[in-house]
Amino acid sequence: MSKSSVFDSVIDLPQRELTERENILLGFESRYESVHNQLNLLLNQGQLLDWSKKYHKSVLPLCKLVAEQYPLVIFHGDVGTGKTATAECIANRIVRESRTEDSALFKLSNRVRGSGKVGEMGTLLTQAWAEVCEAAGKNRRAILIIDEGDSIAASRSQNHSHHEDKVAVNTLIQGVDELRKFGGRVVVILCTNRLSVLDPALRRRAAIVEEFTRPGLTERESLFRMDLGGMGLSDSQYRQLALATGEKEHLPAWTYSDIRTRLYPAAMSRAFPERALSFNDLMELLKIMRPSPVMGDI
């Protein structure tokens, strides 16, 4: 496997595209605020001593404890709730606000699972860590996003856990441990649908654990207002759409992804190119379409 294929993408930060994407991520500001301070602390461990001397006239003992945090953030929750998109935008925002121009964002590819050859997955993960560390060098900042983290970080104690899986988890844990030497310049954001299946040793290392849930009634209505502006819908119609995408009988509520990647295209295909999109196009589809099944921890 070539170097580039270990990652789905490697991009320099900040990116204007990610900055613009913040505007369509419903609830991004509140999510950013909830993790900003702690993430900022994690990313700027090298400045703790100066901060302590400035405001406490000495180095507080807890500075060392905080500086020893593992540079691992876990975003967990049901499928389609915006974990990966939020991780990318938060990484971009942190870099932009810190004015750290020399930064890179890596997205680990699921291809690191390899083809099943003995030792392949561990080797590919080791290669990925090496590339991230090389990119960080002596001064750069690097942020690694691992999507579908449960596919390579499941508990080693599971009955169906194979030797290859255990090696991969060991490699992942060792990699996170080694990243502490960068003093916060390299951080891993692991996204997973199922927090409960992650290896306990990895979960214990997480400095931040943030849960993502399916949007509630108010959030769904806000989403429709954001996305369907210009259609001339009434307040009542927005509320009907929000109610129609809610939990009912044995079906869960719709996810952000369900609405944006399934409902909208299906509705537009009914109208394009001969007429305008209508409220009825959406409502009729909601009678026959179903939300994605729950994939997270129950």
Swiss-Prot record:
Keywords: Antiviral defense, ATP-binding, Nucleotide-binding. GO terms for molecular function: ATP binding; ATP hydrolysis activity. InterPro entries: 26S_Proteasome_ATPase (IPR050221), AAA+_ATPase (IPR003593), ATPase_AAA_core (IPR003959), ATPase_AAA_CS (IPR003960), P-loop_NTPase (IPR027417). ATP binds at G80, T81, G82, K83, T84, A85, R204, R205. The keyword Nuclease does not apply. Gene3D superfamilies: P-loop containing nucleotide triphosphate hydrolases. One of its GO terms (biological process) is defense response to virus. It comes from the Bacteria. Regulates complex assembly in a CBASS antivirus system. CBASS (cyclic oligonucleotide-based antiphage signaling system) provides immunity against bacteriophage. The CD-NTase protein synthesizes cyclic nucleotides in response to infection; these serve as specific second messenger signals. The signals activate a diverse range of effectors, leading to bacterial cell death and thus abortive phage infection. A type III CBASS system. Expression of this CBASS system (Cap18-Cap6-Cap7-CdnC-CapW-Cap17) in a susceptible E.coli (strain MG1655) confers resistance to bacteriophage P1. Belongs to the AAA ATPase family. Homohexamer, forms a 1:1:6 CdnC:Cap7:Cap6 complex. This is CD-NTase-associated protein 6. It comes from Escherichia coli (strain KTE188).
